[in-house]
């Protein structure tokens, strides 16, 4: 199975790549959409300067495609970017790090369907606390690259996600999504066993 991974450099996209490899799939490249502005509907923007390094560490060629901002435009640009590489890369599918966002998963599935590609979200509906704890226990160095929700201390930006910070996220009265799936925070993986 030859797959293209949507890669942001965050914990979920990196874990999705490693999960796909664990299934025996050939992850042939990473694809990063580069929105015109920072307020993208679907795509992770804080790590754009670092994602090349993440791809290099993963041993993946990185494909970058410009992306207009807007609910429809982002999906159109994703589809155009994938369509442009489908044949040259002999793709069978797309891999994403979607955890719980129906918004993302459905749109990626529609793109795959229209292009005749299978879509995989190997982390979909994982038990979030266990998932995050397993990454931390496995030695992943995950940094907060953006804090966007009230209640999460802004000084965590740039800091490491630790078991203590994960516990604090779980206890917060404002109840941000513990994995940041709604954009409450964004992450960058600096190191992982892979």
What residue spans do the PLM features occupy?
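Nucleotide-activated chemistry modules centered on ATP-dependent adenylation/adenylyltransferase
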Residues: 1-194
